[in-house]
Amino acid sequence: MPQNPPQDFDPIAYINAPRWQASRLGLDRIRELLARLGDPQNSLRIVHVAGTNGKGSTCAYIANVLQAAGYRVGWFSSPFIERFEERIRVDGKNIGMPDLARVTLQVREHAEQMSAETGDHPTEFELMTAVALLHFAQVGCRVAVLEVGLGGRLDSTNVIAAPDVAVITRIGLDHTDLLGDTIGKIAAEKAGIIKPGSSVVSWPQEPEAAEVVEAAAHAAGCTVAQPDFGELDIAPVRHLDPERIEPGEPSVIRPFTYKGSEYETTLLGSYQPQNAALALEAVSALQRRGWDIPQSAIER
């Protein structure tokens, strides 16, 4: 592994530099950059999550279950809420600044060479994708949970080969200037993460989007699993005894039952149990593929 970076190198400032700021969809640049880095994504099992609403919480649920099951889990998300480092996590912990600087320097070397040799350069999100995948590979992650940044079909996270599971959250109108001005067009972009050999799990979409997702899955030889919200029973929010919780621990939980099993979430939006049910179906898809995920890990 390369030596520690110089103390005056600021990886966040480098990634956020104006030269990288662009929304140019396409996979050629990220493919080239990752090839120069040795294609670190090929060492990872992947859960790929696209959609308009609920991507972050769905990723969180899946990553937490896999970690509880004993997998070393990388999670790449966008955007961050409080700290830039939230975008790259391993086993629930943000990447540290020394690691972020070290890996960014490695990516910088190849990004600069690529720019000089080809006249083209990666975007900020492509740099981040490369940093995340390289870091996950270097620290020995077995699986990466990747949250799509924009769309899906041409998003830099779609540089991967077939994911074990492609998850599509609720689809709505978003980024219509880039993805299309109808639900159907946007659904086609989101469904672009579906590849032959993957399991597919989708939110129960409205008819126009559902038809597109089903068609994409059929073309790839896949079937689509969905959560059954008729088997979801959401209990009232419960406040915990403040004398029995540690500082920093959540004080409120939302219990729910899905398919006869009891769960709880500390994410309190009224829609969170539905996102959790979607994540549970993704975990079930992984179990059907032979992943060792005991029920005790799911209920934690």
Language-model-derived ranges and their functions:
Residues M114-A116, L127, G140-V148, P163-T257, ...:
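Acidic, Mg2+-coordinating active-site environments of NTP-dependent enzymes
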Residues V73, L267-L280:
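Short glycine/threonine-rich catalytic loop with a Thr-x-Gly-x-Asp
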Residues I62, L66, T129-F136, A279-L286:
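Buried hydrophobic packing segments
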Residues M1-P6, N16, V159-A162, G184, ...:
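ATP-dependent carboxylate-amine ligase
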Residues S23, W203, G269-Q272, W291:
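Hydrophobic alpha-helical scaffolding
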Residues Q21-S23, L27, R31-N42, A68-A161, ...:
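ATP-dependent carboxylate-amine ligase catalytic core
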Residues M1-N53, S57-R72, I81-R83, E109, ...:
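N-terminal leader/targeting and accessory segments in enzymes
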Residues I46-H48, V73-W75, A166, V224-Q226:
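Conserved beta-strand scaffold positions in the cores of enzyme catalytic domains, especially
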